[in-house]
A protein has these predicted regions:
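Polytopic transmembrane helical bundles with strong interfacial aromatic enrichment
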Residues: 1-470
């Protein structure tokens, strides 16, 4: 194998590895921040103590997720300079300011109010504390806005010109509000809420299966399933519109996702399953539904979709990868809709908290939000290849002039460190979830912490328990 391409493959694998670890933590923290804000609002309005109990419980898990997200985000951003210097030199005039806006608005907002949210109980008034929690939740949404603006510009670039081999911005409004941005923003934001809803529902299911029937456990289980009932179908509708937008601006990606090689007139079938073969230029063992591809992607019975053979081989995404990553995402999405629908039926029959079979299903579905999220990102990023800025700069042009050995050494270091550090973080969150919210007869000690060895100076300080004692 050519050394340069070997280094490119390793650099891509390394970035995929680090960004996959990173995205799961912000996704969870985005959803949990809003969930905690709603819980605190309900506590202020009703005065019911279990809302505050749930606030305190989920704030601990949010603190760990937020801390992990910040650390992994910093490491990921360094790779733009170490492994992707070509991209930074070419497009840094667009992506750099967008990331700066994210730090100057969202991160400063989150960092400024996070301490009050985590450590301000009984230090500030309840309304001031709720205001801080609300600001943190808003900050996570603003962060999503800027990150998705940058990523969407790489998918559907506009508002620039190339001068002396570098991107020069000419219209920041066009750059930020590029053609795919609204669809990606709503798709990702709702995905984050669904991720959090599934985690909350799974945690509630675990404690219901263990015999707890206190109001706090029942309430978080119920709230998560109500949210899922609303958002899972909405996500499917947004995904449909996102697909139509992608067909317009990235038709090769759609052809790869659908495993379509030929441009068929009179209606395009949908390949439900199959194994795309990039060398043979065919999808083996395809199970086809006539006209359904046209109906879904063009909303017409005989709409035309260009096949992959319409594009040069060097411009084709890897259909084998995106074909299956997309189906994993969609399949899990239907399972989420099914979970929410069953919950609604059980609720009507008064058996939501008594059906152990359903609770096991909800527990099993807990991690699927993360899996679906990662599958979706694999689809959108692998489907963009071979471009890093679609139609403008190839990924091979973006990589730093490194040897395969250099990239492989850093890759091994990342794998070891990430599994140790983030494995510990995930284990810690699972232990906290297993412990559950405080029982009604065990009051929270939310007095200001004056211990000299437990100064509230970082998110992890919000979690009093040691791993060994949870």
């Amino acid at each position: 194998m050519d050394t340069a391409f070997s280094a490119l493959d390793l650099a891509r694998l390394q970035f995929a590895f680090t960004v996959s670890f990173h995205i799961v933590f912000p996704a969870l923290s985005i959803g949990l921040a809003s969930f905690i804000a709603v819980l605190e609002y309900r506590w202020l309005k009703t005065g019911k103590p279990y809302y505050k109990t749930l606030c305190l419980f989920w704030s601990k898990i949010f603190a760990v997720a937020f801390g992990m997200g910040v650390v992994s985000g910093v490491v990921m951003s360094y790779q733009f300079g170490t492994n992707w210097a070509g991209f930074s030199s070419f497009a840094g005039s667009v992506t750099g300011p967008l990331l700066m806006y994210e730090v100057m608005t969202a991160f400063f907002l989150e960092a400024g109010f996070l301490g009050i949210m985590l450590f301000g109980w009984n230090r500030v008034s309840p309304r001031a504390h709720f205001g801080a929690t609300l600001m943190v939740a808003i900050g996570t949404i603003i962060s999503t806005f800027w990150i998705l603006a940058s990523n969407s510009w790489m998918q559907t670039p506009q508002g620039f010109e190339i001068v002396d081999g570098r991107v020069v911005p000419t219209d920041w409004f066009a750059i930020i509000f590029n053609p795919s941005f609204p669809y990606r923003l709503f798709h990702m934001a709702i995905a984050a809420f669904i991720v959090a809803a599934l985690v909350v529902a799974a945690t509630g299911a675990w404690h219901l299966l263990k015999g707890r029937r206190d109001q706090g456990v029942k309430k978080m289980f119920s709230m998560a399933l109500w949210l899922l009932l609303v958002l899972a179908p909405v996500q499917a509708l947004i995904g449909d519109q996102h697909g139509i937008n992608t067909l317009k601006h990235q038709p090769a990606k759609i052809a790869a996702i659908e495993g379509l090689w030929e441009t068929e007139t009179g209606g395009t079938p949908l390949n439900l399953f199959g194994i795309p073969d990039m060398q043979a230029e065919t999808t083996r063992y395809a199970v086809k539904v006539p006209h359904l591809g046209s109906l879904i992607l063009t909303h017409s019975w005989d709409g035309e979709i260009r096949g992959l053979k319409e594009y040069p081989p060097e411009d084709r995404p890897n259909s084998t990868v995106v074909f299956w990553s997309f189906r994993i995402m969609v399949g899990l999405g239907f399972a989420m809709i099914g979970l929410a629908a069953i919950a609604w039926l059980l609720r009507r029959r008064g058996r939501l908290y008594e059906s152990k079979g359903f609770q096991r299903f909800a527990l099993l579905m807990g991690p699927t939000g993360f899996v679906s999220l990662l599958a979706g990102w694999v689809t959108t990023e692998a489907g963009r290849q071979p471009w890093v800025v679609y139609g403008v700069m190839r990924t091979a042009q973006a990589v730093s002039p490194l040897s395969a050995q250099q990239v492989s050494i850093s890759m091994m270091a990342f794998v070891v460190v990430y599994f140790l550090v983030f494995g510990t973080g995930v284990y810690y969150m699972l232990k906290l979830m297993k412990a559950g919210p405080a029982l009604p007869h065990v009051p929270h000690d939310d007095k200001p912490d004056t211990r000299p060895d437990h100064t509230a100076r970082r998110p992890m300080s919000a979690v009093e328990e040691l791993i060994e004692t949870v």
